[in-house]
């Protein structure tokens, strides 16, 4: 037997609803909240989740004194069942949002088996559009200003894939610098060389040598050599895309080259 309409749910049951809904689904969250054969409807679980409000992250009680801060910024596709009410999505391609995630940390520790971010703090949500992006970054930089001694802080490194919204953040603080993350750099270099078979490693080495030597012109030449021996149009497009990506993010790559 299910709960009657408008029946009250205890705080303990609400907690179990939210825990299970985060891990699996609305339906299982409703089942997990009850004892015996009773269950809370998935619509009730959904309503509980949708009414949640998350306060802004409180600044640290005492300002910390560090010379460098690191920010990792990324986004992901999330599929929606609907936007505001069931049935309002008519086309499959419009049922996704791209929430943004930012985490601020002071360093990375390694204990021999895993890496751990030092004093990590998280920000994120569906901050859509230009104004949403600025609002999110303002929250991040307000937290930094209130939590860290600005006289000691020298640089803020923002790691990401080079998306416009990430670059916006790098332009909103005088001490912020955009850094292209290594994953995306390696991905594009591999994409540009994978078809070269036995020569692939040599071509990659030439690109990495140009990067480590801080020679942009040499990196451009390396990509042009690959294009010269690439016959298939589809692969040529991949090489051209990688070339534009690496050269277009050159300043961000150089921030991590010592």
Regions found by a protein language model. Give the residues of each.
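Catalytic center-proximal scaffold of phosphoryl-transfer enzymes
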Residues: 1-258
């Amino acid at each position: 037997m299910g709960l009657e309409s408008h029946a009250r749910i205890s705080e303990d049951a609400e907690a179990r609803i939210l825990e299970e809904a985060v891990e699996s689904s609305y339906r299982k969250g409703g089942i997990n909240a009850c004892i015996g054969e009773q269950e809370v409807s998935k619509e009730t679980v959904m309503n509980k989740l949708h009414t949640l409000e998350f306060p802004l992250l409180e600044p640290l009680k005492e300002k910390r004194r560090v010379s460098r801060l690191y920010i990792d910024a990324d986004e992901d596709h999330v599929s929606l069942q609907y936007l505001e009410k069931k049935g309002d999505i008519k086309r499959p391609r419009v049922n996704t949002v791209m929430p943004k995630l930012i985490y601020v940390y002071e360093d990375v520790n390694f204990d021999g088996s895993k890496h751990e971010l030092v004093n990590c703090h998280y920000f994120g949500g569906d901050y859509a559009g230009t104004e949403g992006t600025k609002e999110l970054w303002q929250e991040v930089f307000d937290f930094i200003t209130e939590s860290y001694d600005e006289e000691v802080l020298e640089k803020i490194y923002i790691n990401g894939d080079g998306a416009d919204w990430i670059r916006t953040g790098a332009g909103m603080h005088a001490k912020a610098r955009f850094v292209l993350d290594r994953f995306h750099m390696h991905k594009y270099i591999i994409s540009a060389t994978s078809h070269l078979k036995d020569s692939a490693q040599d071509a990659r080495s030439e690109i990495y040598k140009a990067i480590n030597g801080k020679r942009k012109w040499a990196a451009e030449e390396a990509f042009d050599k690959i294009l010269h021996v690439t016959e298939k149009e589809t692969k040529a497009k991949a090489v051209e895309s990688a070339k534009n990506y690496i050269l277009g993010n050159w300043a961000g790559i150089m921030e991590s080259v010592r």
